[in-house]
Amino acid sequence: DGCPPHPVPGMHPCMCTNTC
């Protein structure tokens, strides 16, 4: 999906989901 890796499986970093 073009998003950088995230430490929590099934979740995306803020810059991808725009939610923190």
Swiss-Prot record:
Its main location: secreted. Expressed by the venom duct. The keyword Cell division does not apply. Keywords: Acetylcholine receptor inhibiting toxin, Disulfide bond, Ion channel impairing toxin, Neurotoxin, Postsynaptic neurotoxin, Secreted, Toxin. GO terms for cellular component: extracellular region; host cell postsynaptic membrane. It comes from the Eukaryota. It is found in: Secreted. Disulfide bonds join C3-C16, C14-C20. The keyword Disulfide bond applies. One of its GO terms (molecular function) is ion channel regulator activity. Alpha-conotoxins act on postsynaptic membranes, they bind to the nicotinic acetylcholine receptors (nAChR) and thus inhibit them. The cysteine framework is XIV (C-C-C-C). This is Alpha-conotoxin-like ts14a. It comes from Conus tessulatus. The lineage of its organism: Eukaryota, Metazoa, Spiralia, Lophotrochozoa, Mollusca.
